[in-house]
């Protein structure tokens, strides 16, 4: 059995094992009953990437065994969305006859959406020319005539050619609200669309009786900011990655949300700004007056490394802390500080990555 095969019959068992494992990790903390949010058992990943293998006239997708590093052919990938699986064979068959499009092609990346859009990135070990552009536009039109809503990117060293967009538009349903998100190629997006919707609904439910303003660190493309905006008077959100900030600004505008402001700076710099250690010109340039905000709640979704101690101490200054974590081990380390002043009142497991050891957790903490 290759790693492309899924044991869908064993899905619930692996989820139960994760739930037990995460409860064991946090057994030293007083936690409420664990809320468990399942994933679809297959076709849950909204993105996938494959190496391309050239064998005579043949061309096909391959993956590599993580332990032996041996390659194996992949014609279908049940973990990926149905949209990706539908496109995979048609794309490779369209590439095969064209020497221009297949020459030194070494990788294909897919980014799909629940809304029906899909973006394909073709990576090459050669520079791309006008002939490639002509051919790729023909291929794109051919596949869109088959019913796809497809855009394509060609990449080579220090080179990027876009036909016609380098992003997809996703639509996520959060209770009775439909939110629109711009998701840019090579920027972080939640990999599991169905579970992402459940995470947003959980966050909205946790904060439905809020007052005052919300501060959010590590906001990405505004994924949570937009969903939570209706529960607060204002939202002030920080993000360091420039493409994510640009997407967040687009998402705020397209959803007609007028109470969210995004500031491009790191969580560590923002901590210094909040403490008054130094002034930041970018805050002044964006007319952000930190003293005007009345933030009782803070939302954090840090990278796998978690928050540093200084950020944890800053976060402790808020009445309520909502923490989404992709690494329970660093969440545990942070909770050893946060639990000195706050108690855990909600505790959730989101199965973003079925059949792997990875676990996504959510906790709501309230001041003791």
Swiss-Prot record:
S-adenosyl-L-methionine binds at residues 190, 218, 223, 239, 301. The active site is at residues 326, 360. Its EC number is 2.1.1.-, 2.1.1.35. GO terms for cellular component: cytosol. SUPFAM superfamilies: S-adenosyl-L-methionine-dependent methyltransferases (SSF53335). InterPro entries: MeTrfase_TrmA_AS, MeTrfase_TrmA_CS, SAM-dependent_MTases_sf, TrmA_MeTrfase, U5_MeTrfase_fam. GO terms for molecular function: rRNA binding; tRNA (uracil(54)-C5)-methyltransferase activity, S-adenosyl methionine-dependent; tRNA binding. Keywords: Methyltransferase, S-adenosyl-L-methionine, Transferase, tRNA processing. The keyword S-adenosyl-L-methionine applies. It catalyses: uridine(54) in tRNA + S-adenosyl-L-methionine = 5-methyluridine(54) in tRNA + S-adenosyl-L-homocysteine + H(+); uridine(341) in tmRNA + S-adenosyl-L-methionine = 5-methyluridine(341) in tmRNA + S-adenosyl-L-homocysteine + H(+). Dual-specificity methyltransferase that catalyzes the formation of 5-methyluridine at position 54 (m5U54) in all tRNAs, and that of position 341 (m5U341) in tmRNA (transfer-mRNA). Belongs to the class I-like SAM-binding methyltransferase superfamily. RNA M5U methyltransferase family. TrmA subfamily. HAMAP family: RNA_methyltr_TrmA. This is tRNA/tmRNA (uracil-C(5))-methyltransferase. It comes from Photobacterium profundum (strain SS9). The gene is trmA.
């Amino acid at each position: 059995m290759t790693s492309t095969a899924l044991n869908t019959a064993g899905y619930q068992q692996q989820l139960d094992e994760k739930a037990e494992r995460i409860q064991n990790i946090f057994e030293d903390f007083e936690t409420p009953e664990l809320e468990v949010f399942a994933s679809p058992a297959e076709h849950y990943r909204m993105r996938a990437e494959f190496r391309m293998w050239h064998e005579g006239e043949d061309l096909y997708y391959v993956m590599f065994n993580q332990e032996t590093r041996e390659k194996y052919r992949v014609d279908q990938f049940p973990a990926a969305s149905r949209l990706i699986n539908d496109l995979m064979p048609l794309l490779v068959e369209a590439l095969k006859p064209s020497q221009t499009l297949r020459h030194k092609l070494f990788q294909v990346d897919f980014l799909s959406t629940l809304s029906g859009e899909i973006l394909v990135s073709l990576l090459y070990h050669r520079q791309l020319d006008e002939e490639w552009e002509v051919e790729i536009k023909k291929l794109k039109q051919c596949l869109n005539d088959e019913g796809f809503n497809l855009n394509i990117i060609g990449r080579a060293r220090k080179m990027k050619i876009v036909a016609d967009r380098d992003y997809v538009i996703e639509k996520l349903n959060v209770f009775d609200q439909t939110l629109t998100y711009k998701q840019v190629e090579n920027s972080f997006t939640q990999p599991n669309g169905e579970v992402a919707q459940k995470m947003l609904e959980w966050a909205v439910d946790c904060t439905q009786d809020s007052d005052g303003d919300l501060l959010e660190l590590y906001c990405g493309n505004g994924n949570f900011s937009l969903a939570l905006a209706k529960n607060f008077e204002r939202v002030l959100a920080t993000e360091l990655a420039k493409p994510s900030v640009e997407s967040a600004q687009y998402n705020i505008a397209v959803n007609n949300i007028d109470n969210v402001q995004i500031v491009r700076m790191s969580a560590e710099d923002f901590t210094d700004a909040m403490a008054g250690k130094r002034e930041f010109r970018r805050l002044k340039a964006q007319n952000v007056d930190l003293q005007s905000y009345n933030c009782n709640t803070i939302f954090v979704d840090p990278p796998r490394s978690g928050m540093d101690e200084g950020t944890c101490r800053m976060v402790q200054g808020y009445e309520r802390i909502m923490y989404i974590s992709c690494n329970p081990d660093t969440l545990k380390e942070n909770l050893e500080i946060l639990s000195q002043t706050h108690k855990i009142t909600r505790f959730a497991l989101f199965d973003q990555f079925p059949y792997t050891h990875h676990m996504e957790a959510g906790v709501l903490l309230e001041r003791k």
